Amino acid sequence: MPAYMFVSSKIHDPVRFAQYRKEMQVFAPKHGGKYLARGEILEVLEGKFDTDCHVLIAEYPSVDIIKNMWNSKEYEEIKKLREGAGDVNIFIIEGEDKILKI
């Protein structure tokens, strides 16, 4: 079942964060990850959300793959590149095998 990683980041050190992003663009696909959307928030339709954030939505084959990737020694090294570069919130949700009816 697909899983999705959502990331919001308020970047304080663009140069350092760019190094992290560059590494992740190579690392994530090795684990079946593909970026679905990335950019600045265009508009908050309801509620409160920091619009100074950058947002990323990535799809992976499963929650287990995300967790294994996250806990890998390779990611541990990559993650050091973004330490101190910004405030980051990351969460995952499990997708659906079939289209949901609304």
Predicted segments — roles?
Residues 1-71, 95-102:
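Short S/T/G/P-rich N-terminal loop/turn motif that feeds into the first structured element of a domain
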